[in-house]
Structure formats: structure tokens, C-alpha cells
Amino acid sequence: MWYSDYHVWILPVHERVVRLGLTEKMQKNLGAILHVDLPSVGSLCKEGEVLVILESSKSAIEVLSPVSGEVIDINLDLVDNPQKINEAPEGEGWLAVVRLDQDWDPSNLSLMDEE
């Protein structure tokens, strides 16, 4: 698992396919997640642009995508259960799956450690 400067984790699941989610640290900073606005399956995301909007007990934030590609799956469970992000941000609280528009090369990303 890789951690982007956008506080989004990146988990390769297949060749040129990654799962994305909010880091543990960011979900703690946000407090209770109350609402999630997910992208549409089939939509395109671009590195550094808004992927997801989260509303929490403390604020609303735009979560930026650390990669570019096509959204091929979203976590629909979050629509009715946004608290899954708080309960398991690096597990069942994942946000989206993206098919990358280029080969996976983490050295091209701006990365940080888990903290």
C-alpha cells in the first residue's frame, strides 16, 4: 500500500488497476464522516483533481485523486454507511477503484509514509 500527499492510500489490485481510500490519519482529523459524494463509475479522474467530497462533523473536504484513469468501481456501501470510513478507512471504507491510464509506477507519485 502506498500513501499519497493527498492523504489517499493506493493499493494495486491488478495490472494498471488500483483501489483508493482515505488514510487513517485523515479520517481521524475529520471526525465522524456524515456524507460521501462518490464519482460515477465510468467517469475519468485526473491526478490532483477532486475524486470524492466528504462531509464530516468538523468540515467538508474535497479528496483529490493521486492517480489518473477511469473509475471502474465505487464503494456504494458508503452511501448509506459513511461511517465505514471511520471504522475501517484502509479496509471496508475504501472509496473507489481506478483503471490507470498508464502503467503503475509509484516512483512517479508524490508519496508519504503512513503517518
From Swiss-Prot:
Chain positions with N6-lipoyllysine modification: K58
What residue stretches are annotated with the Lipoyl-binding domain? Answer: 17-99
Q: Where are the transmembrane segments?
A: none
* Claim: Ubl conjugation is one of the keywords in the record: no
Which keywords appear in this protein's UniProt record, sorted alphabetically? Lipoyl
> Which co-factor is required?
(R)-lipoate
| One Pfam family of this chain | GCV_H
Cofactor remark: Binds 1 lipoyl cofactor covalently.
GO CC terms of this entry: cytosol; glycine cleavage complex
Name the source's superkingdom.
Bacteria
> What PROSITE patterns does the database record attribute to this sequence?
BIOTINYL_LIPOYL
Entries under InterPro entries matching the protein: Biotin_lipoyl (IPR000089), GCV_H (IPR002930), GCV_H/Fam206 (IPR033753), GcvH_Chlamydia (IPR017514), Single_hybrid_motif (IPR011053)
* Biological processes annotated in GO: glycine decarboxylation via glycine cleavage system
Family membership: Belongs to the GcvH family.
Q: What is this protein called?
A: Glycine cleavage system H-like protein
State the taxonomy lineage.
Bacteria, Pseudomonadati, Chlamydiota, Chlamydiia, Chlamydiales
